[in-house]
Structures are given as C-alpha cells and as structure tokens.
Amino acid sequence: MEIDVIIPLYKPGKELFTLLDKLDSQSVPVHEVILLNTGEKYFEQLIYGTRFLEKYQNIKVYHVSKREFDHGGTRRMGVKKSSADIFVMMTQDAMPADDNLIEQLTEPLRDQVAVSYARQLPREDCAPVECYTRDFNYPAQSRIKSAEDLKTLGIKTFFCSNVCAAYRREIYEELGGFVKHTIFNEDMIYAAKAVEAGYAIAYAADARVIHSHNYTNVQQFQRNFDLGVSQAEHPEVFTAYPSESEGKRMVKDVTAYLRKNHMSGKLLHFYIQCACKYAGYLLGKNYRRLPGKWVLAFTSNKEYWKQNRKDV
C-alpha cells in the first residue's frame, strides 16, 4: 500500500526542509511528496544552491500561478498527480511532532472511515488563548464520527482539517473528490459529503502535528469572512447545522479557562478578538449583499474573487 503526501506551498521558508526531513524519517514510509507551489520564483529562490532535487528524490514539484490557486481545485490537481492508495493532505506550516505521524494518522482508515485528521499542538510561541483553542478543537481523545453523531455534535461531526488529514482514494473517487472551487473549507465540505454517504470521519489524537498561529484581529476578521463565504456558498452542508452554537460554547469555555488560571486581564482582548471573528463571519455569510470593493477589503484571498466574481 502506497502513501503519498500532498502539500500546497506559497512562499515557503527553510522550515520546508525540516518538514521534508521529518516526513522522510517516518516509521511508515512515504512513497512520494507532491508539492503544489504557488509562485515559482519564490520556490526557486529557496532551493537555489541546495541540491534540492538530488537530496529529495521522491519529491515532485508542480507550479501554479497565484490566480490559478484554489483551495479545492489545487488540491484536486494534487490528488490527480498521485496514484497512491492513501494520500495525506498537509500544509507547509504543519510540522510532524514525531516519527509516528503517518502511522498513527493512517491506522484508523478501515471499515467505513473515509478520512482521518491529526491533532494540532501549539507552537512554543503560541498565545494562551490560542493554546486553549487548540485543546478545545483537538482534544487528547481520539474519536470516530458518523451520521449518528449529528444530533449531539451538530456541525462538529463534519469537522476535519487539511492541515494534516489522510484520505482513502477509493472513497475519495467515489464521492467525487474535493469541491472544485471554494475560498475555504474544502476539508469540511468533503467530510460532510462522506458522512451523508454513510462513511465516517476519524479524529486521530495520537497523530500529532505542531501547528498554531497568533493572528491579529484584522487577520481573524478576514479569515472568518472567508469562512462565512464558504458556508454561504455551500448551504447544503451548513444550513442545517449552523456553527454559531459551537462558537458560543468556545467563548464560555475560554472565559472560564482564563478566569480559573488568573488571566482575567486577557479577557478584554479575547472578547475584542471574538467580536472581530463574528463580524467577519456574519459579513461573509451575507457577502452577496456587499459591494465588490467591500468584499475585496474584507477577504484574505483576493485572487479567489478575481476568478469567480465579475463585479469585483
């Protein structure tokens, strides 16, 4: 059984070499690493003088322009470049925590499980609120989620992250793969399709990657604007199971956490951050009512709109 890893890139730094070295030392070997690079000149600058292709002989590099990149479509392209039975989607800023990542991530892929996703651990520089959010979304206990969990988990049933997730090709092809065009959320849209088809989603807590961000309020606003857009464009997934209740639960949990750990001074910043996220989300869900200039100002992915909306 072959396992490939597919990684979209944009202006990668030297951390890419560390990531590739860690993938090369996994307990279960990776057959090929497929790099989907946006912006060829940045990649060429990175590897200049490194003998990159000599050192990493199992790597294939494909270049796309910034305008061509799409969260769903580019990943679909990567899957087509692979012939492996199982493929792992990763992002360039996700670092394997140990040599067992691929083994632990692919272990649940049996029976009705269509996709498994890894636990995300915070980086050393991670802010306290973001650290707690990692634990909220990626707890220490593994879980299999299916249609039977919709009544209790709601939208969380479909939660899956292409920061690090493994897919069974046979089921992927059966379901039609990732959505061709989306600004965000291609992983959850696929997971929802899998659950609705009778398959399950595995959260593999023992498969761990280091991945976190300390986003500014503006960045949070923009990311959540794009999140809202993705939900508005896919009502078949998100209308029946809105995410607002899950957001409210996280606010309550983080508030309790900060108070319990004598960090009440961080509450104001946290609430402002939440307001920025929620405002972005609401505007994104209603993007069709907004002027094109507003959409371009609010989004973190301007190229998406240049591809998909004539009035922007």
Model-found features: residue ranges?
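Short, well-formed alpha-helical segments that are part of the catalytic scaffolds
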Residues: 12-25
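Acidic donor-binding segment of Leloir-type glycosyltransferases
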Residues: 23-63
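Glycine-rich, basic loop-to-helix element that forms the pyrophosphate-binding segment
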Residues: 65-82
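Short aromatic/hydrophobic "clamp" motif used to bind/position activated sugar donors
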Residues: 87
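Conserved donor NDP-sugar-binding/catalytic core segment of glycosyltransferases
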Residues: 99-131
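A recurrent flexible, glycine/aromatic-enriched loop bordering the glycosyltransferase active site
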Residues: 147-167, 183, 231
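Acidic donor-binding loop at a coil-to-helix junction in glycosyltransferase catalytic cores
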Residues: 183-190
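Non-catalytic, C-terminal membrane-associated alpha-helical segments of glycosyltransferases
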Residues: 226-229, 240-312
